[in-house]
């Protein structure tokens, strides 16, 4: 009977049941991660083909999602427990996840993670950048904006403290080194502020880093500006300046006095970018993060302002 069972296990049908399933487009976050979910699929498919050819199922064994807190892994989704959720605006949350003991997440400033969610039996993945300091111990935080028709938004809005969420990473091609640039020009729209936060904090936390920083945050209204207290605190450092561009407000009269002189109205366009570049105290290197349309437009404006393609990075 045992021999018959082993023969049944080696039938074509049995092997086809073990064949990896190709991911749906919704399972790709679209941020250019390496390894991408499709890279992992092709890896697992090659492993399956080798196992089938040799009739050796042990070759199929690979990393699976870990159900308890563990070290972050770019190939394996790891569960982290939600320990706090703060609503920053009507549609945006700051979510804190626990790390085991006093461990650190292990990301370099500006790197991002991939979140996996399941809604209506459909698996989806999206990229988010932690906003907590790179050296934060025992936790990490992410900034998540929810959209009315977004699948991941439905998943995030179902979260409660004590729930777990699955992440993998880190990913990202920008690596900041102290004093690497004379000045950083940080241009962010909405939640594109996220990768700028740990980069900025790593500079101000390091008394030996003398990099100048000019941060420009683009938002619809004053109320929609994220992390106001943090940004105000950062602007007190001798080497940091912050500016804001509000697209749906037209007057500074209703703004707090501390924002009136550093807020522009309308959109971040070519003229303002030329002014920002010319006002930099040292030769700037620009970091840009926002929607695809925003990053494309800003890249064009930076070139018109005299920067070269190797003088900016698009997240």
From Swiss-Prot:
GO biological process, one term: bicarbonate transport
Domain (FAD-binding FR-type) ranges: 75-177
Binding site for FAD: 157-172, 182-214
Catalytic activity, as annotated: 2 Fe(III)-[cytochrome b5] + NADH = 2 Fe(II)-[cytochrome b5] + NAD(+) + H(+)
Record-level Gene Ontology MF annotations: cytochrome-b5 reductase activity, acting on NAD(P)H
Principal EC category: oxidoreductase
Annotated ranges, domain Oxidoreductase-like: 19-55
One GO cellular component, as annotated: endoplasmic reticulum membrane
EC number: 1.6.2.2
Domain of life: Eukaryota
Pfam family, one: FAD_binding_6
Keywords assigned: FAD, Flavoprotein, NAD, Oxidoreductase
Cofactor(s) essential for the protein: FAD
UniProt record similarity statement: Belongs to the flavoprotein pyridine nucleotide cytochrome reductase family.
Main function: NADH-cytochrome b5 reductases are involved in desaturation and elongation of fatty acids, cholesterol biosynthesis, drug metabolism, and, in erythrocyte, methemoglobin reduction.
Protein name (database record): NADH-cytochrome b5 reductase-like
The species this protein was found in: Homo sapiens (Human)
């Amino acid at each position: 009977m045992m021999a018959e069972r082993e023969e049944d296990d080696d039938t074509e049908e049995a092997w086809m049941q073990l064949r990896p399933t190709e991911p749906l487009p919704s399972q790709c976050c679209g941020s250019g991660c390496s390894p991408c979910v499709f890279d992992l699929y092709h890896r697992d498919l090659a492993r399956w083909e080798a196992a089938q050819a040799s009739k050796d199922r042990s070759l199929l064994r690979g990393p699976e999602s870990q159900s308890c807190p563990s070290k972050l892994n770019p190939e394996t989704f790891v569960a982290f427990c939600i320990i706090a959720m703060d609503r920053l605006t009507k549609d945006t949350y700051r979510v804190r996840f626990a790390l085991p003991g006093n461990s650190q997440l292990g990301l370099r400033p500006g790197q991002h993670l991939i979140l996996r969610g399941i809604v209506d039996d459909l698996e989806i993945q999206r990229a988010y950048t932690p906003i907590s300091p790179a050296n934060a111990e025992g936790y990490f935080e992410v900034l998540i904006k929810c959209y009315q028709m977004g699948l991941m938004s439905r998943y995030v809005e179902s979260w409660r403290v004590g729930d777990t969420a699955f992440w993998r990473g880190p990913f990202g091609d920008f690596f900041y080194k102290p004093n690497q640039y004379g000045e950083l020009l940080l241009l962010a729209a909405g939640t594109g502020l996220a990768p700028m936060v740990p980069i900025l904090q790593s500079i101000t936390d390091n008394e030996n880093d003398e990099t100048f920083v000019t941060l420009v945050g683009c938002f619809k209204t004053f109320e929609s500006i994220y992390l106001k207290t943090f940004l105000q605190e950062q602007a007190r450092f001798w080497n940091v300046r912050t500016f804001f561009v509000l697209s749906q407000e037209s007057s500074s009269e209703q703004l707090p006095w501390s924002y009136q002189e550093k807020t522009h109205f309308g959109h971040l366009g070519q003229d303002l970018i030329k002014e920002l570049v010319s006002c930099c105290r040292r030769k700037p290197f620009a970091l840009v993060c926002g929607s695809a349309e925003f990053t494309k437009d800003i890249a064009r404006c930076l070139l018109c302002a005299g920067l070269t393609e190797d003088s900016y990075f698009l997240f």
